Design a protein with these regions (language model features):
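Extended, low-polarity transmembrane helix blocks
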Residues: 1-32, 47-61, 67-147
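Short juxtamembrane and helix-loop transition motifs at transmembrane-helix boundaries
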Residues: 33-46
């Protein structure tokens, strides 16, 4: 795959991947700040107000870095920190009754899958059609049938 197709797919993937984080911050956590703080407090999150401010910053900054492809590895690390912490505080299915555990196990596995995507970005970078890509030397397209 070369140039336009790879670039379009990489950018589309970055946007789709970060949509959940941006919408969570902008449409839930910020407008419902005190309700989210109360929920975090109930779940035992230490210093919930400060934790929520840090969470919002991680979600927005990390997502923007990934979407525009500038410092995408750092952005992915920021979101990985958020995901790891949130997953173990809010989706601890092993501490729940069977009825609640099923839904939380699905949420846990969803987050685990997204963590895998963050690890891929940390390992491989943002890909084409990114600010990082436009500032690095170009390599000729590999047209071999195995790619």
């Amino acid at each position: 795959m070369c140039n336009n197709t790879a670039g379009f797919l990489a950018l589309s993937g970055r946007v789709a991947l970060c949509a959940i984080f941006l919408s969570s911050a902008l449409l839930n956590k910020i407008p419902n700040f005190m309700d989210v703080v109360a929920h975090m407090e109930k779940e035992g999150v230490p210093l919930p107000r400060i934790a929520l401010v840090v969470t919002i910053a991680l979600l927005i900054i990390g997502s923007i870095f990934i979407v525009i492809g500038y410092k995408a590895r750092l952005g992915a690390l920021m979101l990985l920190v958020f995901l790891t912490t949130a997953t173990f505080y809010f989706h601890d299915f092993w501490n729940m009754d069977a009825e609640s555990a099923h839904v939380q196990q699905i949420m846990f596995m969803k987050n685990l899958s997204i963590m895998g995507a963050m690890l891929l970005i940390i390992a491989m970078g943002s890909g084409p059609w990114s600010l990082s890509d436009c500032c690095t030397p170009k390599v000729a397209c590999d047209r071999s049938p195995n790619t």
